[in-house]
Structures are given as structure tokens and as C-alpha cells.
């Protein structure tokens, strides 16, 4: 039944949901990649859709910006609508010089300055990691599509406008591939409620070089990432 944030019914969502931050990007994904699309959520403008990809039922819905927002939506999808797998498809900023604009990053794990997982885990560090099979399927899908995806750690930041520039040096030293704002929270929610999750990001800007894509480009040109996510779902069905 409907929740305070999702006005859908059980069965409206597929067992796999792709989740960009921007609800308009969710609309673009649904209209571009799915067939037989119908809207299943519009509360607070957080658009959600269900359709089919090569005959496979798949949903896509926005999750908003930051860990608090995405945690609400992912929790409700899992506990109230029976969702089993969540794939965040978003953008990230690069800190390493060998990571380029529009590179695809598969988030094997997620560091964070947020305390949400410590709250969950009795103030201990929680290893926020993606589901192994989902990572493997995404890697295999990228190879099949001829996309040279990077695999490694993301950093989920609470502040978009961070005052601590030195932290980027630390991230680079530790091999962090990209900075975003949600993966660690989504991995924590999935672990808490027995679901599986993965984050795939496209590099939208470079923190060192100050290169960046436009908002319109973020909405329409990150197709490689979406294709990887969708094809990885089909690979997962074969397991």
C-alpha cells in the first residue's frame, strides 16, 4: 500500500529498481529505454515508472539528493513494495587525474563522512559495499558493451560544497574514484533490510581540473551507464 512518500500499490514496482537522483532523469530513462511504461509514483515530484526492457519488468524512480533522501525511498521500496535489488545510476566528481569526464565508475564500496551507518551499527564502522554478483554482472555487461568501466571505491559526502579541500588529497591517496552523495547510505539500507544494491556513476565533473558537464548533458548523455545497469539485470536473471 502507499507510504507517505510513494503513492503506489504492491506489484506496481518491479523487483529491480534503477534510481537516479533526479526524477527528470528517471523520466528520461523510462521514456528512452523501457517499453510499456506507466507512472507509478509522483508524490513530491519524485517520479517513478515501471516498464519492460527486452521483455523484463524493470522500474526506475528518483531518490533525491543526499543520504537522508535516498534512504527514505530505498527503505520504503524494499519493505513496502517488495523490491529486491536497487541500482543507483548517478553522477560523481573525480579526484584522480586518471579518471576522466564521462568515465563510468562501478562503486564496489563507499566511504563516507556521514554517520548514518554508524547509527545503524552501534557506532562502529560498517563496510558499505555493493552486492558482489551485481558488481560482477555490471563489469561483464560493460565489457560486452565495449565500455571501459572503472571499479573501486566511491566517497559519499554529506556536503556538496565541502569546505575541506584537503580531504580530496586524502581521497586521491586512498584511491577513491569518485565523490557523490548516496552510495554509502543505499548500501547500508540494503544490508539492514536484506536487499541487494549497486551504484554505477558517470563522472560529471572533475574536482581537480574543474571540467564539468551541463545539467542537460547529465540528463541525456549518460547512456552507457544506463545500458550497463539494464544489461546487468538481464545477466543476473541467468544466475
UniProtKB/Swiss-Prot annotation:
Q: Which InterPro entries match?
A: DeoD-type (IPR004402), Nucleoside_phosphorylase_CS (IPR018016), Nucleoside_phosphorylase_d (IPR000845), Nucleoside_phosphorylase_sf (IPR035994)
| Gene3D superfamilies, sorted | Nucleoside phosphorylase domain
Q: Where is the site Important for catalytic activity?
A: 218
Q: Which domain of life is it from?
A: Bacteria
Q: Which EC number(s) are documented for this chain?
A: 2.4.2.1
UniProt cross-references to SUPFAM superfamilies, sorted A to Z: Purine and uridine phosphorylases
Q: Which residues bind phosphate?
A: 21, 25, 44, 88-91
What positions does UniProt annotate as the active site of this protein? Answer: 205
The entry marks the following residues as binding a purine D-ribonucleoside, namely: 5, 180-182, 204-205
GO annotation terms (biological process): purine nucleoside catabolic process
Q: Which GO terms describe its molecular function?
A: guanosine phosphorylase activity; purine-nucleoside phosphorylase activity
> What reaction gets catalysed by this protein?
a purine D-ribonucleoside + phosphate = a purine nucleobase + alpha-D-ribose 1-phosphate; a purine 2'-deoxy-D-ribonucleoside + phosphate = a purine nucleobase + 2-deoxy-alpha-D-ribose 1-phosphate; inosine + phosphate = alpha-D-ribose 1-phosphate + hypoxanthine; adenosine + phosphate = alpha-D-ribose 1-phosphate + adenine
Which UniProt keywords are listed? Glycosyltransferase, Transferase
- Pfam families recorded for this chain? PNP_UDP_1
GO CC terms in record: cytosol
Query: Which family does the similarity line name?
Result: Belongs to the PNP/UDP phosphorylase family.
Cited HAMAP family:
Pur_nucleosid_phosp
User: Self-association or partners: how does it assemble?
Assistant: Homohexamer; trimer of homodimers.
Listed name of the protein: Purine nucleoside phosphorylase DeoD-type
From which source organism is this entry?
Salmonella typhimurium (strain LT2 / SGSC1412 / ATCC 700720)
Amino acid at each position: 500500500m502507499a507510504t507517505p512518500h510513494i503513492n503506489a500499490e504492491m506489484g506496481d514496482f518491479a523487483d529491480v529498481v534503477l534510481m537516479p537522483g533526479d526524477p527528470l532523469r528517471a523520466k528520461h530513462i523510462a521514456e528512452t529505454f523501457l517499453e510499456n511504461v506507466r507512472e507509478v509514483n509522483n508524490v513530491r515530484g519524485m517520479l517513478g515508472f515501471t516498464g519492460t526492457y527486452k521483455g523484463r519488468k524493470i522500474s526506475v524512480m528518483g531518490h533525491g539528493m543526499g543520504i537522508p533522501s535516498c534512504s527514505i525511498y530505498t527503505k520504503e521500496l524494499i519493505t513496502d513494495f517488495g523490491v529486491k535489488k536497487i541500482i543507483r545510476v548517478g553522477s560523481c566528481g573525480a579526484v584522480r587525474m586518471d579518471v576522466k569526464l564521462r568515465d563510468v565508475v562501478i562503486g564496489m564500496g563507499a566511504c563516507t563522512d556521514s554517520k548514518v551507518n554508524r547509527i545503524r551499527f552501534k557506532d562502529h564502522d560498517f563496510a558499505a559495499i555493493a552486492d558482489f554478483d551485481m558488481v560482477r554482472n555490471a563489469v561483464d555487461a560493460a565489457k560486452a558493451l565495449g565500455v571501459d568501466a572503472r571499479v573501486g571505491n566511491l566517497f559519499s559526502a554529506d556536503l556538496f560544497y565541502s569546505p575541506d579541500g584537503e580531504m580530496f588529497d586524502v581521497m586521491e591517496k586512498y584511491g577513491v574514484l569518485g565523490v557523490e552523495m548516496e552510495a554509502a547510505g543505499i548500501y547500508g539500507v540494503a544490508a539492514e533490510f536484506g536487499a541487494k544494491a549497486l551504484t554505477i556513476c558517470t563522472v560529471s565533473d572533475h574536482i581537480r581540473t574543474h571540467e564539468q558537464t551541463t545539467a542537460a548533458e547529465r540528463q541525456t548523455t549518460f547512456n552507457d551507464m544506463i545500458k550497463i545497469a539494464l544489461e546487468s539485470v538481464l545477466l543476473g536473471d541467468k544466475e
